[in-house]
Amino acid sequence: MMTQAASGIDLFIPEVYDIVWSLIILVIVAVFFYKFFMPKFNAIFDERAAKIQGNIAKAEQARKDADEAKAKYEAQLSTARVDAAKIRDDARAEASHIIADARSRAESDAAQITASAQRSIESQHQQAIVSLKGEVGALATALAGKILGAKLEDNDVQSSMIDSMIDDLGAKK
């Protein structure tokens, strides 16, 4: 028997036995691939996924740590600013207090110096008055003696005459 050669579209369609044997080989290769290669691929993929997840977790933890450090730094910075402002205000208050104390002491010292100078002036004034009374008295006695032509020897008379002349001079001022 002679077989007829295929023609037309039949040239491209395989025979049934070719399809069956191809399917059997495909199933064997798929089972072999599924049994031996897939677990290794899955292990590698799982390992990479775990590594990626670990890196993501590490990055997330690092971000949280950075946020916490930033918050802590900002809190410390805020506290430092508050402390600096408090120190500045305290220094200003202390400076005002020191200035007020220095001013008070200067005013007190000036008042003491003024009072001391006033007392000194008053003392010198009294000394000048006493000295002038003595000199005026001596001059008045000498003048009265020349006018009267006699020397006034009685101390009581001299004193009363000196006092009356000084009073007359004081009244004329």
Swiss-Prot record:
Its main location: membrane. Pfam families: ATP-synt_B. GO terms for molecular function: proton-transporting ATP synthase activity, rotational mechanism; proton-transporting ATPase activity, rotational mechanism. It is a single-pass membrane protein. Keywords: ATP synthesis, Cell membrane, CF(0), Hydrogen ion transport, Ion transport, Membrane, Transmembrane, Transmembrane helix, Transport. InterPro entries: ATP_synth_B-like_membr_sf, ATP_synth_b/b'su_bac/chlpt, ATP_synth_F0_bsu_bac, ATP_synthase_B_chain. It is found in: Cell membrane. F-type ATPases have 2 components, F(1) - the catalytic core - and F(0) - the membrane proton channel. F(1) has five subunits: alpha(3), beta(3), gamma(1), delta(1), epsilon(1). F(0) has three main subunits: a(1), b(2) and c(10-14). The alpha and beta chains form an alternating ring which encloses part of the gamma chain. F(1) is attached to F(0) by a central stalk formed by the gamma and epsilon chains, while a peripheral stalk is formed by the delta and b chains. NCBIfam families: ATP_synt_b (TIGR01144), PRK05759.1-3 (NF004412). F(1)F(0) ATP synthase produces ATP from ADP in the presence of a proton or sodium gradient. F-type ATPases consist of two structural domains, F(1) containing the extramembraneous catalytic core and F(0) containing the membrane proton channel, linked together by a central stalk and a peripheral stalk. During catalysis, ATP synthesis in the catalytic domain of F(1) is coupled via a rotary mechanism of the central stalk subunits to proton translocation. Component of the F(0) channel, it forms part of the peripheral stalk, linking F(1) to F(0). This is ATP synthase subunit b. The gene is atpF.
